[in-house]
Each structure stands twice: as structure tokens, then as C-alpha cells.
Amino acid sequence: MKNILLIATGGTIACSSSDEGLTPSANVNELLSYIPHIKGKCKLSGISIMNIDSTNMNPELMMNIAKTIKEYKDDYDGFVVAHGTDTMSYTAAALVYMLNNFYKPVVITGSQLPMEAEYTDAKKNLSDAVIYACEGRAGVYVAFDGCIINGAHARKVKTRSYDAFESVNYPVVAHIKHSRITHNEAVQGDYNKSDNSGIEPELCSDVMLIKLFPGIDNKIFEFIKGHYKGCLLYTSPSPRDYAAS
């Protein structure tokens, strides 16, 4: 039986109603109590390393998640990260590169509704994440609404619907329905990595993201040059010389 660690970070999945609206309050043991049926599929334990609204996620906290996985890498067969949806895709992409060549599965999930809500998607999403972590396929994934998405290609596209995430420029890796996994045979991944030499839980936050638009003032690049180590350009897909000009 596989040994899986749930790493709780907060988010809607751990929220409860208060006078100030939804606030992260449920601890990791409470999350585990909502999916008792999973106990027959694996040995599941949990740890809470933060309890935040994911809009407050930042590179340092992302590194804390990676460091936690590195700390427990020899004790568990797979990892599930409970996370808020607003910044889940950022954390997933960051973990893909910080955990490069990591030989165990890391599955990130969350929900559109709190675990305690009547029609919550939290129970299914968390269950699906654990089920896929038990598969033992190395890599970082997002589990949401029955879809398993490569962590580097997940993007939130809806704010209210259960199918909040899509896979961008890459096929969905697998689907889960009634606890059964259907793998996408078109996806050929390196699922059998054998070492952890690629774990580097470090990020450089001195990077600016700029969305190019017609008429952008080039002075902004002079500012970036003096204050940042790098710049990512969000530009049109064509023509290619648009960004170069």
C-alpha cells in the first residue's frame, strides 16, 4: 500500500464562512476527515505548512513547498498539495522546475467551493489527487474536475465553474471518473525517473513580466534593466519580429 503525504497550504478547499467571508481555517486533519474512503487505497497522512489565501502566495512560500517535499522525499511514495486556485498554476509551474527529475508524483489540487459546502467539489478533487499520486508516475500535476494536467501547462480559465482549469498547448494527461484512472495514450512522459538529483528548491524573484501592447513606452525597459535580473515578454504569437522590434 502506497504511503502518501498531504501538504496543506490553505485556499478555498480549507476555508470556512466567517463575518469576513471565506477564510482559510481547516487544518490538515479536518481535510483528511472528509475523505475517509481513501484509507482503503493508501496510507495517508498530512502536514500543514501554511494556511493562506492563495492570492498571498509568493516565491518564498513556493520554495517552502518544494523544501517540504525534499525533506520528506524518502518517507513517502507520493505527495498531494492542497492549494488555492487563484495562484495554483503559478505554484504548479514553479514546482515543475524546482523538482526537475524528481522520481515521485506531486499532485496539486484545490476546489471552487469549501470542503464544508453542500455541493463542494473539494472531496472529489482531493480524492482524485490522492488516487493519482498512488499511481507512482513521476512528475508535477494539477488534479481538478476529473482531469490530470501537466503542472507546466495548467491554467485557470473559469472563476465559478467546477472545470476551472485547462491544459494549454499540451494534452490532458489522464481523466478520473468514479475513482478509475483513464490515461491519455497520446501523452508519452518520463514517468520512471530513478533519482532526485534535480531537486533545486530555489527561485529567483528578480524577474518582471511585461505584456507588450501597441505603443508601449520603451523607457520601461530601461527601468527593468536597472532593477531586475530578467524580463519575460508576454507578446503576440505573430509576427515574430514584433517582439524584436
Summary of predicted features, one role per range:
Residues 82-103:
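Short Gly/Thr/Asp-enriched flexible loops that form oxyanion-binding sites at enzyme active sites
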Residues 1-70:
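ATP/NTP phosphate-donor binding region
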